[in-house]
């Protein structure tokens, strides 16, 4: 250990002595960015650690994450004249946005008459009336312009014969406020829409003078007196620590699917932004709502897009029955994802699953023309062959619900500003924004509609940039930062680097994932959730006995995975405790011991004569969760759902009703 510490000091002394940053890889990589961004603005600081080199940077804005939301926010800010840094642990085109398949919703009306208000209605209904209707109004009204903007950026959308953007059917989408049949609203690039969107946004970002700090792992927010003043990050390439001081910080770090054993998420989906906010003493919102995508490949968990069913694919049980006709007579296989996942689970439970163990169902595509499969679903055809050994033109795909998306996240308003709830009012956290899957506006409520996620990314990434441009002016003088700001983050990094317990990071992570998978699944019960809370408390405490093996600082993936596990753990405990506390079934949160939705009124009956339940006695409200990082103890509070649209005359709010498809 002494030798390692000495090596760290040598690196620190070398950087400190030269008083200017080495041009790491700028000459070698020949990319559009400098690894250290605008080097003239960077200064060496010795106020945090003598062992770890600490470099200070000043920007108007810093964006954490470079997926769809992060890129859209970053180049939107640069376009508006803000000196912007984008800090990302991955090269931008490696972000998980690249894995999205199905498409992006917008009421363009290319296939039939459509209206964004019908999209608004479907999204509110899909959220099981937990979505904030002002934010849903904003997103759905902005959707057509957002898609046209992407087209102007060069996104190669699939086309109809007459050259318009092709739009496919997707789950939970209807015409005429649910009374006009299935809508075709999902704009797509075959079944690789996320790939095209991410590369389009990345290509667009090259037009602007944004400083990209690639393969930098964000550790924590720099908070002072309730205001966010930037972030502190680890440069994984050389082990130096960087403090990014900025008047505006945008979190776009994605979801935390890797808290579960079977999921469609990349291994980098570790909820880093949620965890940073939690450690800053701020709440996360609605983390109990975890979406299980109906069609993950059995045994692998790889995503099979909902677009398969949008193109005409059907789900089949062991009796050869198209069973969704029983559960959703109108929408059938294109009911919302929570409905389809529960229906599949019931079929398997009741003995109508397929395979030797009758533990999954089939997705049938071979009745569709091969030309259609080749043109509209080329990626799925390849994925099914690689991961299931299935030729989709001849055989069905074995599928099973798998964790796919987190409806909850960092609470924001529709402008992207992070909020807290005190004294019956929402309060903006100065200098802090969130968007994408990390944020919770809340446009998805208790259940996200397919193809609303990519829309969420571009609309609210742009909204963050617009809000900052409206409030601030580029080049404003920054308030001073305490010399030791970020000291606790560096101390934690050092502690994890030299952790010498008896349990590997991978072992603790697996215990967490299996606990979450078995205790917070598609169907939940009070006893199982309580047992899960107890087990997660034990798993959380086991972090005190963690052991890391790599004592280096350059590309120490053991250290980074351990820091990611800390982040996952904070997300996991909030998820399962929030789920145990919510005594109802709503959207993706299905309780077998509380099967009904508990609203302020019983909306299955006439409202006349009913007495409104007090806020404390119903569950149509957002969960706000706080964690003590030292103990893992979770504290819950609640805030009301926003039931009004942005303009009642232009778009009437949708009152709660019984949700059926």
Swiss-Prot record:
UniProt keyword terms in alphabetical order: Electron transport, FAD, Flavoprotein, Membrane, Mitochondrion, Mitochondrion inner membrane, Oxidoreductase, Transit peptide, Transport, Tricarboxylic acid cycle
Enzyme class: oxidoreductase
Pathway field: Carbohydrate metabolism; tricarboxylic acid cycle; fumarate from succinate (eukaryal route): step 1/1
Membrane-protein topology: Peripheral membrane protein
Residues engaged in binding FAD: 66, 69, 88-89, 95, 97, 102, 218, 272, 437, 453-454
Localization, UniProt: Mitochondrion inner membrane
EC number(s) per entry: 1.3.5.1, 1.1.5.-
Co-factor requirement: FAD
Transit peptide: 1-39
Active site per database record: 337 (proton acceptor)
GO biological process, one term: mitochondrial electron transport, succinate to ubiquinone
PROSITE patterns in UniProt: FRD_SDH_FAD_BINDING (PS00504)
Pfam families (alphabetical): FAD_binding_2, Succ_DH_flav_C
MF annotations from Gene Ontology: electron transfer activity; flavin adenine dinucleotide binding; succinate dehydrogenase (quinone) activity
Record text on activity regulation: Enol-oxaloacetate inhibits the succinate dehydrogenase activity.
Residue numbers of Tele-8alpha-FAD histidine PTMs: 96
Highest taxon of source: Eukaryota
Residues involved in oxaloacetate binding: 293, 337, 404, 448, 451
Annotated Gene Ontology cellular component terms: mitochondrial inner membrane; respiratory chain complex II (succinate dehydrogenase)
Function: Flavoprotein (FP) subunit of succinate dehydrogenase (SDH) that is involved in complex II of the mitochondrial electron transport chain and is responsible for transferring electrons from succinate to ubiquinone (coenzyme Q). SDH also oxidizes malate to the non-canonical enol form of oxaloacetate, enol-oxaloacetate. Enol-oxaloacetate, which is a potent inhibitor of the succinate dehydrogenase activity, is further isomerized into keto-oxaloacetate.
Subunit details: Component of complex II composed of four subunits: a flavoprotein (FP), an iron-sulfur protein (IP), and a cytochrome b composed of a large and a small subunit.
Name the record gives this protein: Succinate dehydrogenase [ubiquinone] flavoprotein subunit, mitochondrial
Organism encoding this protein: Danio rerio (Zebrafish)
